[in-house]
C-alpha cells in the first residue's frame, strides 16, 4: 500500500487551499479519528491512482491565529463547529481548480463508541464518502503521478 502523504510547510497551506486540483488533509497524528481515517484514505487514494495527499497538522493551525483566520476564511461555513478554534479531525478537503468542491470532517455519524475501531461497515461508509470527494475533483479519473 502506497503512502501518498506529503507534509505541508506552514507557508504552503493557504496556497494549496487556493490553487490547483488536489486533496488536503488536516489531521492530528495522535488523534484516534485521524488514525482510523488514514488507512481508509490510503486505500481510496490508491484506487484513484492518487500519489499525493497534502497533510498539515491541525494543532499547528490552532496555535497560529493568522493561519487559522486564513484557513477558516477559505473553508467558510463548512465546519461542523464554527465556534471552536480547533478542527474536528480529520478534515479532508477536495479542491478543483482552486475551489473547494468537497469537504469532510470527522469520520462517520454512526461512529459513537470511541473505545473501538471503525467497524467494516463504517470503513465502507467512510470509503464511499472519500470516493465521492475524489470523483468530485477528477470526474473519477486521476492519472498516475498526478496531484489529485
Residue ranges and their predicted role:
Residues 1-11:
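N-terminal "domain-start" segment that seeds a small globular fold
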Residues 5-7, 26, 50-74:
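Thiol-based oxidoreductase modules, predominantly thioredoxin-like and allied folds used
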Residues 12-55:
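Local sequence-structure signature of Cys/Sec-based thiol-disulfide redox active-site neighborhoods
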Residues 23-26, 53-57, 91-94, 102-103:
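Structural recognition of the beta-strand scaffold that forms the well-ordered cores
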Residues 24-30, 60, 114-117:
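Second-shell loop/turn segments in exported
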Residues 33-35, 63-66, 101-104:
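Extracytoplasmic/secreted cell-surface and envelope-processing proteins
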Residues 70-85, 93-95:
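Short, internal strand/loop/helix patches
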Residues 85-148:
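Non-catalytic, surface beta->alpha helical segment in thiol-disulfide oxidoreductase systems
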Amino acid at each position: 500500500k502506497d503512502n501518498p502523504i506529503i507534509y505541508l510547510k506552514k507557508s504552503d497551506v493557504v496556497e494549496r487551499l487556493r490553487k490547483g486540483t488536489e486533496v488536503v488533509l488536516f489531521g492530528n497524528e495522535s488523534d484516534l479519528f485521524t488514525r482510523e481515517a488514514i488507512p481508509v484514505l490510503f486505500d481510496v487514494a490508491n484506487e484513484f491512482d492518487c500519489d499525493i495527499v497534502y497533510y498539515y497538522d491541525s494543532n499547528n493551525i490552532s496555535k497560529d491565529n493568522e493561519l487559522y483566520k486564513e484557513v477558516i476564511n477559505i473553508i467558510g461555513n463548512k465546519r461542523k463547529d464554527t465556534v471552536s478554534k480547533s478542527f474536528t479531525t480529520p478534515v479532508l478537503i477536495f479542491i478543483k481548480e482552486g475551489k473547494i468542491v468537497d469537504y469532510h470532517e470527522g469520520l462517520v455519524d454512526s461512529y459513537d463508541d470511541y473505545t473501538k475501531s471503525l467497524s467494516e461497515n463504517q470503513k465502507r461508509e467512510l470509503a464511499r464518502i472519500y470516493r465521492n470527494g475524489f470523483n468530485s475533483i477528477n470526474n473519477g479519473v486521476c492519472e498516475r503521478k498526478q496531484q489529485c
